[in-house]
Amino acid sequence: MRTSHRNHDPMSLRFPAEWEPQDAVLVAWPHAGTDWAERLADVETTYVALGAAVTRFQRLVIVVADAALEAHARALLGAARADLGRVRFVQAAYDDTWLRDSGPITLRDGDGFRLLDFRFTGWGGKYG
């Protein structure tokens, strides 16, 4: 995301607290190119359970690498009776499922939000 911060008061920005209302949960679906490759089937079972639980209460945004992975995840979630009406898939390239580290950082800006984007290097390529 590219945006200008000129003429903006940085003191108006803040991190939302973990307990504040949220619109959705954001996850990246594991695939063979992620750090879960050796345990992919086991990890997918956990993601399916997570997806079914989250969609009982709110929306879920799932990042997938391509259309084939989206179809695969959709089938698994559907079989687990996740509410697919609350799921949004976004296709993007990624090699790390830990979106807390590599995903967007959300800031409150008055009544709105800003997303910060940065280049995550896996702690200087420690695991690359």
Question: Locations of the language-model features?
Answer:
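The feature marks the mature, well-folded catalytic cores of soluble enzymes
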Residues: 2-128
